[in-house]
């Protein structure tokens, strides 16, 4: 998630997007898809990293989506875009997140309604919209320092791969690829110098992590990586993949050996260290894991994955009050992150702060689109706060805001 945020903000700086207050949601799906919606909502499937073979290809997809956003291809005809940010976020993405988080029927119902609304909106895309997004996206890629040829290259590969497929990825249904579109993007890309960034080690490491996340046979993957390393032992990405495969298959000491070889080269590389932290946690070496996290946080105090790792470790050691302090700092910079609100609810529950627990749950449920649950949680909070007029009034005001947002969503989906 941190990589997506930083990379999209980098693209946004050179894009035509005027309001760069963006909200990000990563969707746990191996299917290829990414989209940008009104209110600055950026959605990315894990599958994008599986299909985009280089960082420039990944950036080409995101630049294309930012172009849709900047030209308001989704939002034309929608009034008061700024006021609609949170409701639109919940309507378009909430059901998917809720289902992924185990919210069951509520999540699935939201998915059905939001997919229908999204499909209606996407059917309005014209060939002109896609050409405009391609043109602006290529310009943005070049300005951001990437090789714009990555866009036609990825389109061409996807067209060859899914030319005769009856069930192509959702991205290709909403963004159909044709010979003429590929030719047009290639002609535009060729107008720029070919000296932009194609790829990076960081992207390949993250891509490897996503691949191993969806890998169903880590033992077979480890065998494959060993074969690659036998031929070329200097391939750090393959060694990282081997370490993750070993970790996933329970070969903890072998994974440690693989990671140590990588850390000898770059001891402060966050990606490698996060894998060691995961390894130490799996081996119940929580003190070692926490010492590593705290050492790295001195170097990278604002690193989101490191802060999340610290919270997880503190909770595993029943140090909920310390975990909540870390989360309180995180939520100041990420107020619309449902993952953080979920963890805040957990820490408040462990601290027996029941009113705070219900308030945090309400924020979480609202962000994942389940307003009924959010409103219900605030009902429970108000009952507990009945003897505190000021607190009860604040809770009631928040509840009324949720009721209004829910009404706006229902009106939008009619």
Sequence positions of predicted segments:
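Extracytoplasmic and endomembrane cell-envelope/extracellular-matrix remodeling and assembly machinery
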Residues: 2, 117-294, 302, 370, ...
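Catalytic Zn2+-binding segment of zinc metalloproteases
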Residues: 56, 66-83, 101
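Active-site recognition of the HExxH zinc-binding catalytic motif
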Residues: 44, 60-68, 72-73, 133
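Alpha-helical linker/edge segments of TPR/alpha-solenoid repeat scaffolds
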Residues: 179-183, 284-291, 318-322, 350-360, ...
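Short pre-active-site segment immediately N-terminal to the catalytic Zn-binding motif
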Residues: 46-60, 124-128
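Canonical tetratricopeptide repeat
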Residues: 241, 275, 309-310, 343, ...
């Amino acid at each position: 998630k941190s990589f997506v945020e930083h990379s999209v903000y980098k693209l946004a700086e050179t894009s035509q997007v005027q309001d760069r207050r963006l909200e990000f949601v990563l969707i746990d799906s191996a299917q290829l898809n990414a989209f940008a919606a009104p209110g600055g909502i950026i959605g990315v499937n894990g599958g994008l990293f599986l299909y985009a073979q280089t960082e420039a290809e990944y950036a080409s997809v995101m630049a294309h989506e930012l172009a849709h956003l900047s030209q308001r291809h989704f939002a034309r005809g929608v009034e008061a875009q700024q006021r609609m940010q949170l409701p639109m976020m919940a309507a378009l993405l909430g059901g998917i997140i809720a289902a992924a988080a185990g919210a069951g029927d509520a999540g699935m119902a939201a998915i059905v309604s939001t997919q229908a609304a999204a499909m209606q909106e996407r059917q309005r895309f014209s060939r002109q919209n896609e050409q405009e997004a391609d043109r602006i996206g290529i310009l943005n890629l070049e300005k951001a320092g990437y090789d714009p040829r990555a866009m036609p290259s990825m389109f061409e590969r996807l067209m060859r791969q899914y030319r005769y497929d009856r069930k192509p990825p959702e991205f290709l249904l909403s963004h159909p690829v044709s010979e003429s579109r590929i030719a047009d993007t290639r002609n535009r890309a060729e107008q720029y110098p070919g000296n932009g960034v194609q790829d990076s080690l960081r992207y390949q490491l993250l891509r490897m992590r996503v691949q191993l996340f969806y890998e169903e046979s880590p033992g077979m993957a480890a065998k494959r990586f060993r074969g690659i390393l036998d031929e070329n032992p200097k391939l750090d990405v393959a060694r990282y993949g081997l370490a993750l495969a070993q970790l996933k298959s329970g070969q903890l000491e072998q994974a440690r050996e693989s990671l140590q070889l990588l850390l000898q080269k770059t001891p402060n590389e966050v990606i490698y260290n996060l894998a060691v932290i995961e390894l130490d946690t799996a081996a119940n070496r929580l003190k070692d894991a926490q010492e590593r996290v705290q050492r790295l946080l001195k170097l990278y105090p604002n690193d989101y994955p490191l802060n999340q790792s610290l919270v997880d470790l503190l909770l595993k050691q029943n140090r909920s009050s310390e975990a909540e302090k870390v989360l309180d700092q995180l939520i100041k910079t990420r107020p619309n992150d449902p993952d953080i609100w979920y963890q805040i609810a957990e820490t408040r529950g462990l601290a027996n702060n029941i009113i705070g627990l219900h308030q945090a749950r309400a924020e979480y449920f609202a962000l994942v689109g389940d307003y009924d649950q959010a409103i219900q949680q605030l009902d429970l909070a108000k009952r507990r706060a009945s003897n505190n007029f000021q607190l009860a009034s604040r809770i009631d005001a928040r509840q009324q805001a949720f009721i209004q947002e829910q009404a706006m969503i229902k009106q939008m989906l009619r």
